[in-house]
Amino acid sequence: MEPTFDIPDSTDWLDTPLTLLAPFETSLRCQVCKDFFDNPVITSCSHTFCSLCIRRCLSTEGKCPTCRSSDQELKLRRNWVVQELVEGFKNARPSILQLARMAQTGTDDSGDLAAEEPASKKRKIEPNAIVGTDGLPEEGIRTRSQSRGASRQPQATPVQVIDDGNDEDYMPDGLVPCPVCGRRMKEEAVFRHLDSCTGTAEELKPAAFGSLAPGPRKSFLAATGKPPERLPVINYSLLKDTVLRKKLKDLGIPNWGPRALLQRRHTEWLNLWNANCDSRTPKPKRELLRELDVWERTQGGNSVTPTDPTNAVMNKDFNTEEWSANYDTDFKALIANARKKNDAVIRSTIPNASQANSDTPRSAQLVDQPIEASLTPQDVDEKSTMNPQDAIDNRTEVPPVPDPPQALSGIDRAVNSPMKNVTEGDAQAIPISSSASTHKTPH
């Protein structure tokens, strides 16, 4: 059978006649943890929270959880009135709730009984009742007040049964009581005990170390005699890793893990320690270390994160083909958008990239194509009858070609060479295009 947990909540009053206590109890609960205030403190914006809850919020966001206004940890002040209200209500809550539920049950039962009772409410006197000389009823008849008083009378105390020595199941323990204080002890120790016996029974002492029964817990204030001092907030950006690890070691908390984990661990320890300073009965350090260990296993370095490879396990019934078919359109759209962005980046970084790409085949065609291939038979005849001097003068009409190939190196040598070194054979060796033959320089 699974255990049931009775968690107190403000909605417990809604099923009772005291429904107005529901909003009252809600006002005594923290808006962060939804539990009764524990060491309540008030902020600069006049909102009350648990000391640990508001310190965690301020260390993370620096804002009030209720009104979202900026606040600082140094401005927090203890709210003793709310603490006393919470303690008093927590002590009286079980009794008040029990009485309210009993009243609700009694009201329902009385309504059912009233429906079953007849209209006449006259009482009949029993015939064998005996009436006294003074006119008061005797034991045969009891009035309502007498019945009520009899029900309030305490019942008889239970009779104490003394074991008889003749009982078969009696097992003597070999101890005898002291005739003065009644303490049981061995027979040979009675005489030594009588010399120091005061006549009163000694009170039971708390369990010693190593016993199964735990002794009463002492607070930090009772153990040390002075309240704990608050820890200051430090700027982690000014501390190196070695200094930060040494500071954690001096505080008695773990100093392993990366720098981010060290900062989170130190911040949590500051919140636990300073919140404990707001309590009337501070906890000992070992309990705070136990709470830090719980945080370590749930949110710290020992917690199970979603990035753990042991948890990255796909469902065995997962259908990859169906998933791909359902989201194929989305995948194609993402790929198309990625290509468009890539082309846009290329055009933005190289403005003439598209124009250069379109002109590249034409330039290659002009370079690779021989000049003689573009000549007509008429141009060939004109070339044969052309004056060498005209060919030299028309050399400037040839359009410049960027990065000329080796086939045109002869033209460059002819153009760049001095005029006096040009012979008739060199002039005839220079190929002339159709454009050059049509645009002749007049003499």
UniProtKB/Swiss-Prot annotation:
Keyword check for Signal: no
Pfam family, one: SAP
Transmembrane segments: none
Keywords: DNA damage, DNA repair, DNA-binding, Metal-binding, Nucleus, Transferase, Ubl conjugation pathway, Zinc, Zinc-finger
Domain SAP: 239-273
ZnF locations on chain (UBZ4-type): 175-202
Keyword Nucleotidyltransferase: no
One Gene Ontology term, aspect cellular component: nucleus
Protein EC: 2.3.2.27
Binding site for Zn(2+): 178, 181, 193, 197
PANTHER family xref list: E3 UBIQUITIN-PROTEIN LIGASE RAD18
Role of this protein: E3 RING-finger protein, member of the UBC2/RAD6 epistasis group. Associates to the E2 ubiquitin conjugating enzyme UBC2/RAD6 to form the UBC2-RAD18 ubiquitin ligase complex involved in postreplicative repair (PRR) of damaged DNA.
Protein name, UniProt field: Postreplication repair E3 ubiquitin-protein ligase rad18
Organism in which the protein naturally occurs: Emericella nidulans (strain FGSC A4 / ATCC 38163 / CBS 112.46 / NRRL 194 / M139)
